[in-house]
Amino acid sequence: MPRLLIAASGTGGHIYPALSFADSLSNSWEIVWLGVPNRLEVELVPEKYNLIKLKVGGLQGNIFRKLFDLCKLLFASVQVSVLLRQKKINVIFTTGGYISAPCILGAKMAGIPVLLHESNAIPGKVTRLLGRFCDHVALGIPSASEYLQRCRTSFTGTPVRTEFLFEKSLPSWVPLGEGVLIVVMGGSQGAIKMNEMVRKILPCLIEKGCRVVHLTGKNDCFYRNRDQEKSHPNLVVRDFSDEMPALLRNADLAISRSGAGAICELMVTKTPSILIPFPSSTDQHQELNAAYMARFGGAIIVNQHDPEKNILKNIVSNLLDSNSLREMKLNMNNHDYSYPEKKIFEIIHSIS
């Protein structure tokens, strides 16, 4: 049985695509997972994948701290190289982040092929520096190839949970009716500024007969103890929902940040969207992620602004009062973002 090592650690943006890909594989593959102690993967990675934890960090701080971290990186790379030989790993799949660096270097020492997946339109630091040492780099957004001229790249899309791939009925708590269904995804960090923009236009949306599901994120406490402000039958406010596949499959419009995870979920579910990039994202990658969807007419970009301005209100009103939503839906349907897992597996098969 061939053995695949998956190296994914730290944030959901690194872990969830790797989990989705792992779950798509048949039982003919044995999977070993390489992570970091006390990080999110300890909670998320199921027991059926053998999770091995390795202490590693980024190159941060002053020159002396960076030299110390560099020594730790080289030591970790040697550890990975030994591990790969001990576990008789055939091929590696990694999604970037701190754990990827020693994994890529260790694989180079051991002569084991590596497929690196990059979800964002602007590759992360590890991808830019070490992508050239990988046998292939799979891209979630095709424009990322512009930054990886020395790498062998292919556009595959980013894996999502299988639940996003099939039609699903709406949860019972979503307002019933014929009105346009708008799903607002505030993000796990709260997206407080974006939520403020959306709250300002809620009266307009309700007046136009829209049904609104506002997922604020756990850090936005505006609605707590303000039940009178979320009591309209066509408005549902929640911190989060684990039924995102059903919500996006049935939504007429999403209002969202433009992280890589949100982009791939919107693409797979063919959901037209208004994207509000987080202005402080690393390298402004959310702006370029959003530009990918806007380029073929699947999304409209609205920069974060003072809620008192009417920019978001005017754009939403225009969408609701015209055929633009229908045209955006057609554009989404005509854009191929299907079967990322299958495309990634084909690359893994070709390099292993």
Curated annotation (Swiss-Prot):
Pathway: Cell wall biogenesis; peptidoglycan biosynthesis. The lineage of its organism: Bacteria, Bacillati, Cyanobacteriota, Cyanophyceae, Synechococcales. HAMAP family: MurG. Cell wall formation. Catalyzes the transfer of a GlcNAc subunit on undecaprenyl-pyrophosphoryl-MurNAc-pentapeptide (lipid intermediate I) to form undecaprenyl-pyrophosphoryl-MurNAc-(pentapeptide)GlcNAc (lipid intermediate II). It is a peripheral membrane protein. Gene3D superfamilies: Glycogen Phosphorylase B. The keyword Secreted does not apply. Keywords: Cell cycle, Cell division, Cell inner membrane, Cell membrane, Cell shape, Cell wall biogenesis/degradation, Glycosyltransferase, Membrane, Peptidoglycan synthesis, Transferase. GO terms for molecular function: UDP-N-acetyl-D-glucosamine:N-acetylmuramoyl-L-alanyl-D-glutamyl-meso-2,6-diaminopimelyl-D-alanyl-D-alanine-diphosphoundecaprenol 4-beta-N-acetylglucosaminlytransferase activity; undecaprenyldiphospho-muramoylpentapeptide beta-N-acetylglucosaminyltransferase activity. UDP-N-acetyl-alpha-D-glucosamine binds at residues 11-13, 120, 161, 188, 286. This is UDP-N-acetylglucosamine--N-acetylmuramyl-(pentapeptide) pyrophosphoryl-undecaprenol N-acetylglucosamine transferase.
